[in-house]
Regions:
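Single conserved hydrophobic/aromatic residue that forms the stacking wall/gate
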Residues: 1-7, 12
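A cross-kingdom feature that marks ATP-driven nucleic-acid transaction machinery
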Residues: 14-183
């Protein structure tokens, strides 16, 4: 049996993260402070971690969970496309002349169709703005026709946003509870 500890994201620029969440947590938070922790100051080290640092870390892990959910949904035939390729997209937005990214991409290589998603591990955010940016980013993923847009969030979206998404027919909301519903 082989285990992959380090994974390279499918993207334009090289990015390596530990595929195993335990190793990732250890090398991100424990190893830099191992002397303090072993010296008995573990509680102080933990209390010194800001909500922002933990939120950023959990946000990256949340993206991975969302991608895994898309894979499982595709295998079960519950996605609107038959996706077989999963990952992220990073690159330059020529209109803004800056780096941009798409948190999750699920693609059907045969039909050249894909869905893209934004993953928000925050208590609140501008839902309309996030959806507008997601639609803009569809033009950045070259070689695929983006047909569906997913907004993954820690908490449920507002009723107004959910109503707009349902009316669009191509936008879907997935909450943390939804991610674990079929397990």
């Amino acid at each position: 049996m082989s285990a992959s500890l380090v994974g390279s994201e499918m993207c334009i620029r090289d990015s390596y993260r530990f595929a195993d969440a335990c190793y990732d947590f250890w090398y991100t938070f424990v190893m830099p402070a191992v002397g303090d922790i072993e010296g008995g100051a573990g509680r102080i080290v933990a209390e010194g971690l800001s909500d922002e640092v933990l939120g950023t870390y959990l946000g990256h892990r949340f993206e991975r969970v969302c991608s895994q959910w898309l894979l499982e949904e595709s295998l079960a035939g519950r996605l609107p496309i038959r996706a077989s390729s999963f990952g992220q997209w990073w690159g330059t937005d020529p209109a803004l002349r800056q780096q941009d990214d798409v948190d999750v991409v699920a693609a059907d290589r045969a039909s050249k169709t894909a869905l893209i998603g934004e993953c928000k591990w925050r208590n609140s955010f501008d839902e309309t703005e996030v959806l507008e940016k997601l639609h803009h980013r569809a033009d950045l993923v070259k070689g695929y026709r983006i047909e569906f847009f997913y907004l993954f969030s820690k908490n449920p979206l507002s009723t107004a946003t959910l109503r707009k998404m349902k009316a669009s027919g191509d936008e879907f909301s997935v909450t943390l509870d939804d991610l674990y519903r079929h397990r």
